């Protein structure tokens, strides 16, 4: 190597992973984009099953002619074997999203309600599920929703919106905060 030259060396050989593609919309992180992540198990089934050090993960997929195509990269934390790893590879350019507060009502000095609308347009050729992540404060309750709601913790809840090709899905919900 020459002076001041850097060389990248793979720590692990190429692994043929069984991955799950996750589309996620989180208004608090990116108000107008749907992120794309790949999730996999750090297991022997996936040619891994060993502690993974923190660092950059680069993701490639085979092109139509069999050559490798770079699709994204992310940094991961130290990951023990048999745990899930999630790598965010970028934003979906063919899924459009719009979020708006449609109404706000003050019920009492300590209670308010908001009507929220999230529009998702899928321009892909296949059906995808977009996880819509929402956050709230205080004592909250989703009182009405066009899709089933899933409480993640005291500050976060989610909806799974199935989006068919070239169609729009409109999620509406009412949240009451105390």
Language-model-detected regions and their locations in the chain:
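Long, intrinsically disordered, low-complexity accessory segments associated with secretion
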Residues: 1-178
């Amino acid at each position: 190597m020459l002076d001041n030259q850097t060389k990248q060396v793979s720590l692990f050989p190429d692994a043929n992973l069984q991955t799950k593609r996750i589309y996620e919309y989180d208004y608090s992180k990116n108000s107008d984009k749907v992120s794309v992540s790949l999730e996999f198990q750090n297991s022997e089934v996936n040619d891994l099953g060993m502690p993974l050090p923190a660092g950059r993960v680069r993701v490639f997929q085979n092109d139509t002619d069999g050559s490798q195509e770079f699709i994204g990269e992310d940094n991961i934390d130290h990951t023990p074997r048999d745990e899930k790893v999630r790598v965010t590879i970028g934003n979906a350019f063919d899924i459009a999203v719009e979020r708006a507060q449609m109404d706000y009502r003050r019920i009492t000095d300590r209670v308010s309600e908001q009507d929220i609308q999230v529009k998702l347009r899928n321009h892909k050729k296949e059906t995808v599920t977009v996880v819509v992540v929402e956050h709230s404060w205080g004592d909250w309750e989703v009182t009405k929703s066009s899709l089933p709601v899933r409480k993640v913790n005291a500050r976060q809840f989610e909806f799974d919106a199935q989006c068919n090709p070239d169609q729009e899905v409109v999620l509406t919900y009412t949240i009451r905060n105390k």
